[in-house]
Amino acid sequence: MRAAVLEDGRFRVREHPDPVPGPGQALVETAACGICGSDLSAVAHTDEFLRASRDSGTTSFLFDPDRPLVMGHEFSGRVLSYGPGATGPEPGTGVVGLPWAVDPGGVVRTVGYSNAFPGGFGERIVVQAQALLPVPPSLDLGLAALTEPLAVGFGNIARSAAGKDTPAVVVGCGPVGLGAVAALLERGAGPVVASDPSPLRRAAAARLGAHAVVDPAAQDPVRLCAELAGARPRPTVVVNCVGVPGMLNRLLHTVPRGTEILQIGGVMTEDVIRPVVGIYKDVTIRMCLTYPPEQFGATLARLAEGRIDPASLVTGEAGFGGLDAAFASLRRPEEHIKVLIRPGQGGTGVTARRAPADDMPR
């Protein structure tokens, strides 16, 4: 199969061995695959990324950087076939799936972060058959690839204390942060303040219905949320979706007493916090990786029912040959929100899908 293979920090488009579904597994033809923030970290900070996996004792993000790797875990596609004993949606059915597979030794691997299980930056993927969900006909198959990143936002808000009239702040409005904004609004939280330096991303948060959007260089989002919530400080849910060293400590110092901080952004290096500040303020910190499995299906349903417009979040598309350009562009968040990789698209650049909104907050 054709694939964009990561070698020495660059993507090279070439032939790669076809994955073969084992017992309980499915073979899927890739329709589209999103580029995740963790993909950017894995390429730019490979040693730290792998060290964190080893130090945490997880096998989900371990790969050999000296061997070819086909990344991409935010995928959608069509079922081609099944391995022994596997059943699921009929071949030809459009699907999305939780990106996991079990290797012959019984170890769970993440598709796209395993040398043995190539991801959606290749033409075909092998995943566990039970991880697949059919895409409803009301949802474009390519746009269904946004199910995974949005599920991270929805799933972690579902685990939080956020409810009706809970003041909330979302720091970082990439796809995960925007999923968190939508999830908070769905639960009746408010005021919901979204913070991002990028006007493009602030505009997306505003379109979703955030009560206020701010540039953190100009205004502190936590203080603004407190002002909007009223004179008496109230416990707040703060969702930190940026992997910026020092941000967690900064939030500890500014949030109201009793706040819950969801740390979703992955800081690749060691960081420093002053725990006693959080202790004195009775702050809860929840480190967040992914989502309860049922939230994946619930997020797919939200997209299919039109409760979120995935097309408004996709700002660019590229083929395998455009991956280097797409990664470079996503490191400049003022340019894009989500870039989808489409196997059939040619060229070496990123094609813009959506112009910045005229009513973009400045």
Residue ranges and their predicted role:
Residues L139-A218:
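Mid-domain Rossmann-like dinucleotide-binding core that forms the NAD(H)/NADP(H) cofactor-binding site
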Residues N249-L252, P293-R362:
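C-terminal hydrophobic helical "lid"/dimerization subdomain
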Residues G22, E90-T93, Q128, G163, ...:
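Residue-level recognition of short, solvent-exposed, well-ordered loop/turn junctions
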